[in-house]
Amino acid sequence: MRKLLMILCTLLLVGCGTTKSVKVEQEVGLLQTVKERGYVICGVNSNLPGFSAQDESGNWSGLDVDFCKAVAAGIFGDSSKVEFVGLNASQRFPTLASGNIDVLARNTTWTISRDVNLMFEFAGVNYYDGQGFLIPTDLDIKSATELDGAFVCITKETTSELNLNDYFAENNMAYQPIYVEGNKDAKAKLFSGECDVFTTDASGLASARAGAEDPSKWIVLPEIISKEPLGPLVRQGDQEREAIVRWTHFIMINAEEAGITMYNVDMMLTAKSKEVKRILGVEGYIGPMLGVGMKFGYNIIKQVGNYGESFERNVGPNTPLALERGLNNLWKNGGVMYVPPIR
């Protein structure tokens, strides 16, 4: 009996050890696969100017595009080492789950069902948003509570559709859905008069309005009917890649807080601040802890910039979207951008 117990204990120990070994090999393999491939594959919105869109030459730009470039800069020291895959709302989750992309940075709301049921890991929030309504001014509507009976352009299988159902039910209103495949399709239907109103994240409405022939003929109603914390995500069980994606975002926020920009980053290498030195890899081992080089933070800021620079360049007041920082400002400037320190 004692011998049998010893055998069982040995098998259990070996089994536990094997599981751990396989897990470590899987984790290392996921990052190693990206390194051996030589570039990051990033899923983005196919057409959401300000966040992710292509110009006539096929070059991608936007807040989410910058984030993907930052991940590439952190891993490879080269922000161009990224391949973009344009995805619509229905394609994004199956594509991520299948492993055909490494990161999804596509204006995606962090929810419990996506976190738990779909087995994804959100790496943070890179844009705090809320759902609104875009209408033509000639409708002479001042409030979303006046939209009873409206034909509403809405993307199917999104949080926007669920929020819309809740809002209209709570206000004893009805609507006729006009389903669209994405922002490009929504704009076409809205501007042609096929629908009365387009509803999505307020940032998406600003992007749509900026693309109108005459933006002054379109207004975003004052009601914001939801919380939409948007951020990048990876598959669960992908700890190393998740850590790199998460700390890429944290580096960009911490750099802005520390006053490090893509223009002064070289000068900041000799700064006295210990925090600055850790961010830039002059001291500490932030990069190696993530499985990448010492210049992880330096390369991100040098090649892409801090979060504030990316925001201003892509969606800020001097862009067609003309968005204010609002909630997306640093915590010390009245916003909610607050991330863990580099220690």
Please provide the spans of the model-predicted regions.
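Sec-dependent signal peptide recognition
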Residues: R2-L8
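Extended ligand-binding regions for polar small-molecule ligands
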Residues: G17-E25, D66-K69, A73-I75, D138-I141, ...
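Short, hydrophobic alpha-helical packing/hinge segments within bilobed ligand-binding/sensory domains
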Residues: L30, F67-C68, Q91-L96, N183-K189, ...
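Bilobed "Venus flytrap"/periplasmic-binding protein-like clamshell domains
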Residues: I41-G50, W60-I75, D129-D185
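Acidic, polar ligand-binding/catalytic clefts
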Residues: K69, A73, G77-E146, S203-I224, ...
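C-terminal motif of bacterial Sec signal peptides marking the signal peptidase cleavage site
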Residues: L12-G15
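Extracytoplasmic small-molecule ligand-binding "clamshell" domains
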Residues: K23-A105, L330, G334
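C-terminal functional modules
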Residues: L280-R343
